[in-house]
Amino acid sequence: MKAPNHPRTALKSAPARARFLDFACVLLATLALSSCTGSAGKPGTNPDPPTVTISISPTSASVQEGSTKQFSATIAGTSNENVMWSATGGTVTTAGLYTAGAAVGMFTVTAKSMADNSKSASATVTITAPAPPPPPPGTASSIQKDGITWTFSKAVTVGQFVNGDYFVVGPVTITAIDPAPTTSSPYLNGSVLNLPTANGKSGFDSRLNDGTDESWWFDATLRSYPPITLKPGDVLVSSISLAQIHTDPEVMRASDKSASPVKSVSVLTVLSAAPSADAFRPSYCDRSQTIYHANSLQRDLLPSLAPPNPSATPPLAQFEAYYRRPWIDTNAFLFDAPADYMPSYGQHIAFADSYASLLLMLNFTADQKVNLTNYFVQYGIDLYGCAQAGYGWPAFGGHRSGRKLPILFAGVLLNNSGMKNVSVAHPNIFGEDMQTVYVNRLPPAGTFTAAWQGAKVIYGGHYGVNADGSVVSSGLYGPYEQLQPANWPLINPTEQLGEAYRRCCTSVSWVGEALAIHLLHAENIWNHPAFFDYVDRWMTEDDTQAIAEIRAQSGFDYSANWERQGQTRFWLQGEFPQYTFIDDMWKSYR
């Protein structure tokens, strides 16, 4: 049925229509005269043309000698958006790609409008020298690294990788290690030759204890004692034990103590020949010793964003100190993580990875980013080698987050297809992917179309969901958001597992990881869109009504600030000084 006319739009009487037509004719005549006299009302003049403006992005950049930086120009006020590029100190293509020359100093890149040659915009480019390479290989009868001393039977060729770790050209024999490994319980200061990846056991220190005795994860047969003969392909990881366990603060969570009895580790790699000065250390899991090169890093792919809250932005040096030394990641629950600088819980690893990667998206100079970039890429290389060797970090509550991002970060910067496709070659080895799933994929397929509160993407539970949609373990350890809260499985009448871990120990640590991948434009190579949709849900979904309904149906209360969706800061507050950094970055750049 057609809507009736509104009283104000109904036709008037005939005289009124006539008056309206007279007025319309006068108005048209006036408009015609105006069009002949121009905008200023002066006969014979044309309207002022729009002003052409041009801007350039970024307005400043720091580039190493011989490296490239992409610039772009934005034109307004004309349909001709063509620009003419020019540069000092290097060359620039017609597409705005600048290549730095060999001279160090400050130079400019300029974009000039071809519609109006009087309009241009310039950016300042600081060309810097590359970071000095490690010293060239030499000979030595012993070497010292971060408190570990290895003594050889004779002088051998030694050198350092780009991250500072040592190599020797083998074969060699180690006759002494300081501090010396103990030969009886408690087993301290252990050295392990060629870390195992099959069973998650450790040989560094027998005092494994995270509040309960975990010593069954220790295997004394993994320990090596001098004399140790090493051949090319071998990797010796030597450790220093803490004098007393549970004394080091947990990295990224200051109120806790690290669960590990290991203070620090150093890695000695045995090669058949000295590598180039820009070589990364091969992964400690990689017996084939694949070597990647720092000079191959596409550092210009890192954005140069303004810190949204400078006072809440941590210094690069803090995370350089965390990642400079090896993060050993082959013990099933990180009971032997080097406590001085590595977290002993997956959630805290994910937080550290988030901070490190997001810092590298900011507008620090190229020189300032070099060290942390190298260290973070080295961690990615190590993890990738372990994945290739058959190790993985499948879902287990909050233990297995944080390992995928460093691999993909390294893969993007090295343009390495194997790293970029790690989850294609090795499905079901990353906690974040197994614990985020579209609800309609839960078996039997098509049974569920939405979660209890309407969400399409849900938390996959403690053990998660495999890439093929199969549930690792149903019930207590499986997905549950497809059910009403009254039907959620319980550990006991006073404890939930799934929702408690969703809010305490997993989701909150994935936000920075997802944002870093967005900023690298690497969502496709992550190869699991449910992860990004879930993180968006965590940050944008108002859970006020859901929390009230959970309380009404089950009696469990998740209303504490640190348990709420839409934040990371309340979990980090009091644990890390710059606790709003991830939230600030999300608000500004997501």
Where are each of the predicted segments found?
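Ser/Thr/Asn(+Pro)-rich, low-complexity disordered segments
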Residues: 134-404, 417-590
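Short, well-ordered beta-strand segments
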Residues: 76-89
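Solvent-exposed, low-complexity, repeat-rich "mucin-like" stalks and linkers
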Residues: 57-79
